[in-house]
Amino acid sequence: LRTMSDGLLTTGVTSFLPTTLTSSYELLLAVTENIGARYKEATGAKIRGLYFEGPYFTEKYKGAQNPAYMKDPSMNEFRAWQKAANGLLNKIALAPERDGVEEFVRTLTDEGVTVALGHSNATFDEAKTAVEAGASVWVHAYNGMRGLTHRELGMVGAMYELPHTYAAVSYTH
């Protein structure tokens, strides 16, 4: 963490969210324990939270995410990770078509956690349901999501149509 923190500061970054990939529950727990115990030791860019990119994705638009660990959202898992992280887990990305997403998103956003949508084959309606529950960010716009067609607006159509959301596009890959 210190190496990342110091390196980021040399590029002008003053704060960041360490980010995970889809992994096993146990590995993610170890990561949250490590960051939760050491985040104050950052001597460069400050750690302002923790971002989980996964594991609640679907395989079709998996990108670099490991499908072996993709699953439906679990409040029990999230609570364990949040406890291990000392409350730092403040952003998570998921696929809106997973079972239980609406309640999961509503609970997390009510608690101040930012929910992002990506790595998903969701329909427009599935994405809309997640946004109405509180999701507010689109991850990997166009790349990690179902595209727009004349018969199904998909995630891309939802990204354009639904208000009060933010789309992130990476041009560095």
Range-by-range predicted roles:
Residues 41-44, 101, 162:
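Short, structured coil/loop segments at alpha-helix boundaries
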Residues 154, 158-167:
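His/Asp/Glu-enriched, well-ordered alpha-helical/loop segment
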Residues 5, 32-36, 78, 105:
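Generic structural signal for well-ordered alpha-helices
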Residues 31-44, 128-132:
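Short amphipathic alpha-helices and their capping/turn segments at secondary-structure boundaries
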Residues 36-40, 82, 159-160:
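N-terminal cationic-hydrophobic initiation segments that often serve targeting/anchoring roles
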Residues 2-31, 45-58, 85-97, 113-115, ...:
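Divalent metal-dependent hydrolysis catalytic cores, especially in the metallo-beta-lactamase
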Residues 59-155:
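Divalent metal-binding pocket/active-site signature
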Residues 172-173:
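Conserved small/polar residues in nucleotide/adenosyl-binding loops
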